[in-house]
Amino acid sequence: MASELKKVALVTGAARGIGLAAATRFLDDGWHVAMLDILGDTLRSTVNAFDRAEATLALEADVSDPGAVQAAVEQARRQFGRIDALVNNAGIAVFKPLLDVTLEEWQRVLAVNLTGPFLMTQAVAPIMRDQGGGAIVNITSISGLRASTLRVAYGTSKAGLAHLTKQQAAELGEYGIRVNAVAPGPVDTAMARDVHTPEIRADYHDHIPLNRYGLERELANAICFLCGDQAGYITGQVLAVDGGFDAAGVGLPTLRNERRNQ
């Protein structure tokens, strides 16, 4: 068992992307990290690449499966002795017009994106309560704060997660457990680079005051801040890490282009 002086984070969806960036930042800050993902082979390769066997643990599990969640959380507790932070990052998306989304697709997205964080928190919170507190960060999305096309299931699941965050904060605060959410805007992940054409990226840039995509490490910085002592009086908040995307409203590309050309 690792020293109890080391803080421990459990990060879901940790095999790649924002989850991996958060796990990396925790390790850089001296934490031990249990990394959970449904992509077992990718996860194990990622964990092996750290070459930090004493500080890392790979947990293959589906966050929508109650039994798998309980088993994974118990394995993390046995390995490290405690869990100080939970990052509910695992998520999936279906991008289709509303009338084309099937019931099965709708249910699967909500199962992973909303029920998953519920199950993970139900499993981890008693451990945090018994050790005197902890921090939970749910990864929602700008799509949960403002409607958009082609993401009825995804956006609805993330809006629900934003409210779940506040509900958890209201009820778990008495145990010293803080619960917040990070709502990413467009992020320069490998997936985004694969599916966002130059035209799509230009459209996003026009609506983002900082005129660029966010970086995975910038999301990790926000996550780790909310899990740390400097955020000790912050709970029940949804922090948009989006370059101003949510604040800006509708872009006016023609006016902006004319101004730039003056």
Where are the language model's segments positioned?
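Conserved glycine-rich Rossmann-like NAD(P)H-binding loop of the short-chain dehydrogenase/reductase
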Residues: 29-45
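Short, small/polar-rich loop/turn modules that mediate ligand/substrate recognition or access, typified
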Residues: 87, 173, 178, 234-236
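Substrate-binding pocket helix/loop in short-chain dehydrogenase/reductase
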Residues: 97-98, 105-110, 204
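Active-site helix of classical SDR
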Residues: 121, 157, 165
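Alpha-helical segment proximal to the catalytic Tyr-Lys
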Residues: 126, 170-171, 232
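Residue(s) in the substrate-gating loop at a strand-loop-helix junction
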Residues: 141
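C-terminal helical subdomain
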Residues: 181, 202-234, 241-243
